[in-house]
Amino acid sequence: LAGVTIVDPQTTWIEPTVTLEADSVVHPFTLLRGETTVAEGAQVGPHAVVVDAEIGAAAIVGPFCYVRPGTVLGARAKAGTFVELKNTRLDEDAKVPHLSYFGDAEVGAGTNVGAGSITANLDHRPGVPKKRTVIGRNARVAVDTMFVAPVTVGDDVWTAAATVVTEDVPDNALVGFPPRQTI
């Protein structure tokens, strides 16, 4: 643990299988489990849970974040406050800053995801595997965007607030603008 900062060791749980690199910081009430790796300069917590995941150099796992098995955060990626990631890859400089769920997804480099955005990938039929969502590089995902997997969204795509993406979107597209309904 040379060069690692554990802000409050009494409230932090780190299993012996976890790897922490120099200059990483673990904030209070954080749980690191399994084959988790936290790279140089990364920060985790407070109140975060990371299980069997890779946290890249200078990446941030924010407060109350749950990072589940199979997740990889690239260099300088951010999984912010109240974010859950499962089997998801955030490439370098990708950000999911707050209040989002991304499962079985890939988020390209430089992409920013607005609050309340999710991937919907569960098929309740027995034996049906979960589907993936792929979002390209430098996309701008507005608040409350839902991706219904399987779906692929290209590079430099923008979504409007409250958009439901149910089919593939080409590069450089603007998608959304659901009609207003008064009931």
Protein language model annotation of sequence segments:
Residues 1-60:
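Extended, small-residue-rich solenoid/repeat segments and analogous flexible loops
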Residues 47, 58-183:
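Glycine-rich hexapeptide-repeat left-handed beta-helix
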